[in-house]
Amino acid sequence: IMVAISAAIMPEHYNQGRWHATGTIGVFGAAAAAGAILGLTPEEMCNAFGVCAGLCSGIQLNFGTMAKPMAAGMAAKNGLMAAILAGRGFTGRADIFDTDFLDNICTRKADIEKLLERLYGPYGIHELRFKRYPCGAPTHSGIINCKKILAEHPHTIEEIEKIVFEPY
């Protein structure tokens, strides 16, 4: 579900510099996983997603603070909570993806055709990669290249005046 939602609203959702997709999209993935484990009915799952729409959060303004990684934990917690509540009869907007919800967290109209294509297409898990370093994926190429440069041209930290890296 996360891959499908991402297909509909990325890269604008992230690139507009406001949203932290781990928190805003991750909550739906957590609810889907929890719902599958809990054996939610389709109706309960739709209610869980409706609850998630009200709980999704994560802003790029928190990057560099303790609140940034907390968005991932909150997405997991909120997705699990939404699934548990829905399994106990709690309702949310069951037709949330038929509304303009996704348009509101994107700078353009969400591409629902892409969402459906990814939802019913190959599973996104086959595209997953392990992160080699404990930091944002866009910085990995810089780390790899710095390691290559240092291997070819050893320097001490005192010899390096400045490193400039612009991942975007």
Residue ranges and their predicted role:
Residues I1-I5, R108-D111:
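Short glycine-enriched loops at secondary-structure junctions
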Residues A21-G23, V27, A32-Y168:
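Functionally critical mobile loop/hinge segments
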